[in-house]
Amino acid sequence: MAASKPVEAAVVAAAVPSSGSGVGGGGTAGPGTGGLPRWQLALAVGAPLLLGAGAIYLWSRQQRRREARGRGDASGLKRNSERKTPEGRASPAPGSGHPEGPGAHLDMNSLDRAQAAKNKGNKYFKAGKYEQAIQCYTEAISLCPTEKNVDLSTFYQNRAAAFEQLQKWKEVAQDCTKAVELNPKYVKALFRRAKAHEKLDNKKECLEDVTAVCILEGFQNQQSMLLADKVLKLLGKEKAKEKYKNREPLMPSPQFIKSYFSSFTDDIISQPMLKGEKSDEDKDKEGEALEVKENSGYLKAKQYMEEENYDKIISECSKEIDAEGKYMAEALLLRATFYLLIGNANAAKPDLDKVISLKEANVKLRANALIKRGSMYMQQQQPLLSTQDFNMAADIDPQNADVYHHRGQLKILLDQVEEAVADFDECIRLRPESALAQAQKCFALYRQAYTGNNSSQIQAAMKGFEEVIKKFPRCAEGYALYAQALTDQQQFGKADEMYDKCIDLEPDNATTYVHKGLLQLQWKQDLDRGLELISKAIEIDNKCDFAYETMGTIEVQRGNMEKAIDMFNKAINLAKSEMEMAHLYSLCDAAHAQTEVAKKYGLKPPTL
């Protein structure tokens, strides 16, 4: 399969296909589009433009260049990450100096008394006497002239800090709100309120506050970035859990399904029907399957597969299973596979469990079920169960090349590159004609060399890619993986040629167009051409969530938040796993939060 995902994470190609966020829940940064945080090898699935902590906020690159221009002390903006201590005397905002005139002396005395009370409170605070500190800050608030907004905001923020030490989160939020009302860009108060909202489980409010903090700080403070990432993940998981259980199953595109099955060579259920299994009668005008010589739901399902009439497969398999027919084990495995393809892992697991437990079933059926269940476990972030299933598959069917091929992908995801290469070697020994395994072995070696910064090994891996595409000129995946390695090496022109080869071989593979579009942005900063190619991907396959997600990400960077949110929502509706959906909700929520913060604080998003 060509240009599936940014080749970073991996194992889903074997089981729960996901053209969105991929498999793992983290991992190390590696080569690919812009140092993405996860590796996805992906034979049959397209991966997303993944974003790490804080990077979801796509203003960071531009904001960092501004080096705190236009930020006065009144904002409370500081570069250190420690925020627990109260503040000393606040500097007035520009234009808010002490008034001159008849009442100036009285105001100064009132302000001085307020400052003295605050200073006394600070001493109590540092001594751990928070109740006494609160009394002093309350006195400062009552003494302070009402027109002294900046000073008043500091007193409220200091009192909030004392309430925070007593874990009185409601009072913390209330005092921080007062401080922000008086000084809208008061970073320290905004962040303290964000933490209080987190404790009160007010995730939406927490996200808006911490988003404002990240923007005002220019994405320079790790503490606020981590909180932003944390709350986005929590919101994403919460929303995905509710949405996913009520989602309508959706069959992926024919290209996606064919690519998925192409990653298996020892899979009985995906092999063409034998001559004895069907008659020579033509199919009727209604598109019904060719008559099979046996009254078998499974054989009808197989015929529908050959006709790419995928929507009827699950029901025909169910007929075979209900009748306890001759092909019951095959029907269970085929039904489970299509449950996985439509993103219904809960329905797939019982079928896979049953096939695995059928000792009398063909060993290749049981091994294939173990591969798919193991890959499903990996997508659910259960690596121990996943590893157990792959090892069991190798034990019961040691001559099955698929076991080593897909276990190799698992090992890459687990950062066990040497073991991955050994598995790919075993797959190649068993199936010398396996172009996919040879291409993925090259990529595993390349990744190892890249992360180890070993230039000679990088060159050896690049030479290996050349040999693979020369030996297997019809393997689109070889060109796709090579293109991603070339992109890492800044060889953009040659990478573009490799993507063109992929498109020639698989013109209906939408993900290749997305990768080629991203390359135009990285290589030539050609936004129009990049968007044209991603739009072409959607035209080819309107179920390609990778394309919608990437389009949404670019629209955020262009400042088109409404369109970005629309793209993310389309991707959410196409997500094939709860984890993928949670990731997409995080992107969508980040865009929503930036929109609200921009309105509230008058911040105009920078554009590409």
Curated annotation (Swiss-Prot):
Forms part of the preprotein translocase complex of the outer mitochondrial membrane (TOM complex) which consists of at least 7 different proteins (TOMM5, TOMM6, TOMM7, TOMM20, TOMM22, TOMM40 and TOMM70). Interacts with CAPN8. Interacts with TRADD, TRAF6 and STING. Interacts with MAVS; the interaction is enhanced by Sendai virus infection. Interacts with HSPA8 and HSP90AA1; both interactions are required for preprotein mitochondrial import. The interaction with HSP90AA1 is direct and mediates the association of TOMM70 with IRF3 and TBK1. (Microbial infection) Interacts (via C-terminus) with SARS coronaviru/SARS-CoV and SARS coronavirus-2/SARS-CoV-2 virus protein ORF9b. Keywords: Acetylation, Host-virus interaction, Isopeptide bond, Membrane, Methylation, Mitochondrion, Mitochondrion outer membrane, Phosphoprotein, Repeat, TPR repeat, Transmembrane, Transmembrane helix, Ubl conjugation. The lineage of its organism: Eukaryota, Metazoa, Chordata, Craniata, Vertebrata. GO terms for molecular function: mitochondrion targeting sequence binding; molecular adaptor activity; protein transmembrane transporter activity. It holds the Pfam family TPR_8. The keyword Nucleus does not apply. This is Mitochondrial import receptor subunit TOM70. The keyword Cell division does not apply. The chain crosses the membrane at residues 39-59. Changing R192A: Unable to induce IRF3 activation upon Sendai virus infection. Loss of interaction with HSPA8 and HSP90AA1. No effect on mitochondrial location.
